[in-house]
Amino acid sequence: MKYGIAIFPSKTIQDQANALRKRYDPRYSLIPPHLTLKESFEADEETLSETVEELRKIAKETEPFHIQINKVSTFEPVTNTIYFKVEPIQQLNDLHTKLHEGKFDDNQTHPFVPHITIAQDLEHDEFSDILGRLQMEGFNLEDYVDRFQLLYQLDNESWTVYQTFVLGRD
């Protein structure tokens, strides 16, 4: 089965992201707005049990932190994806690193760019128009991160929470 690890932002940020995703993200219905910490990976029952134990340990050792979103950005020219750019901070980078070392495979296909996708799979003209409009809008979003989620993928390709891990606690 496929699993992944993500942070779900507050309802305020999810609502703002979803207002755009409904129109500009064909995968809108598959997963709520999120910040991916670890891309999808395969795990069987035994591996999953070990993964959950390791995630508990990492969560306990990680203190909650704040994230800041001040603008939109893009992965152009690689893809026509537009996202809320999460300002990189040490705590977030450390959490990401812990999920790609030790008992975890380093399955990264790209450098870690903390973000919340708001538009993807756009035609070039639409991409340029939307990006230009969103770059003129001011964004000043802050969130308190005190947990992350282990997700699994269903047969219809949607993702659902398997378990939540609260930071700084058993």
Swiss-Prot record:
Name the residue ranges of motif: HXTX 1: 34-37
Xref: Pfam families: 2_5_RNA_ligase2
Q: What is its EC number?
A: 3.1.-.-
What species is given as this protein's source? Answer: Oceanobacillus iheyensis (strain DSM 14371 / CIP 107618 / JCM 11309 / KCTC 3954 / HTE831)
Q: Which InterPro entries match?
A: 2H_phosphoesterase_YjcG-like (IPR050580), Cyclic_Pdiesterase (IPR009097), YjcG (IPR022932)
Query: Is Lipoprotein tagged as a keyword?
Result: no
User: Where is motif HXTX 2 found?
Assistant: 115-118
Q: Which domain of life is it from?
A: Bacteria
* Transmembrane portions of the chain: none
The record, for Gene3D superfamilies, names: Cyclic phosphodiesterase (3.90.1140.10)
UniProt keywords, alphabetically: Hydrolase
PANTHER family, per database record = PHOSPHOESTERASE SAOUHSC_00951-RELATED, PHOSPHOESTERASE YJCG-RELATED
The molecule here is called Putative phosphoesterase OB1230
* GO MF annotation list: hydrolase activity, acting on ester bonds
Tell me the protein family, please: Belongs to the 2H phosphoesterase superfamily. YjcG family.
Q: Which residues form the active site?
A: 34 (proton donor), 115 (proton acceptor)
